């Protein structure tokens, strides 16, 4: 490994069009992502062999196709993967941290990350599970409920987020 290894920030968004960045000529305002793109590497010919969130994350995590992970649609990421990118980066001396939606089972499995902070979009698979986002939300909006915005986690329509922008899950994740 080089004396000063490069910093790696991998951002994976659900259902994000490849051209939906200001730096790609889109009128959307995305200054922070544009800066990361200009100072880092912007992949313009990316391809997802399975354009669904959980299978796509499994492919990225393992370096395998959906046919090899067994995830051709929504389902659980295999628990025992031979190779996992976060663990491989750990083995090279990197500190790895996952934040946001993972949709793994069990939900707190780390898949090689040193730490994870989870926002599971309201998905609770174990009685004792509480997402880190919801804990944070309660600290910042006591008595509030992130599910009262009128916008579902997987709605097919857009809407205005009715709470303060600072409380949005995307803001928390970033």
Kindly give the residue locations of the regions a language model identified.
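Formylglycine-dependent sulfatase
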Residues: 1-174
């Amino acid at each position: 490994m080089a004396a000063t290894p490069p910093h790696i920030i991998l951002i994976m968004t659900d259902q994000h069009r490849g051209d939906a960045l200001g730096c790609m000529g889109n009128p959307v305002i995305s200054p922070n992502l544009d800066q990361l793109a200009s100072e880092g590497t912007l992949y313009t010919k990316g391809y997802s062999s399975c354009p669904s969130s959980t299978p796509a994350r499994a492919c990225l995590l393992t370096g395998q196709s959906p046919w090899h992970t067994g995830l051709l649609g929504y389902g659980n990421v295999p628990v025992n993967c031979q190779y996992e990118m976060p663990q491989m980066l750990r083995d090279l001396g990197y500190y790895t941290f996952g934040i946001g939606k993972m949709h793994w089972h069990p939900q707190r499995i780390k898949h090689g990350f040193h730490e994870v902070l989870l926002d599971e979009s309201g998905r609770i698979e174990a009685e004792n599970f509480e997402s880190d986002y919801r804990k944070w939300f309660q600290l910042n909006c006591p008595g509030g409920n992130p599910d009262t915005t009128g916008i579902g986690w997987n709605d097919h329509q857009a809407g205005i987020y009715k709470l303060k922008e600072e409380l949005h899950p995307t803001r928390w994740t970033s």
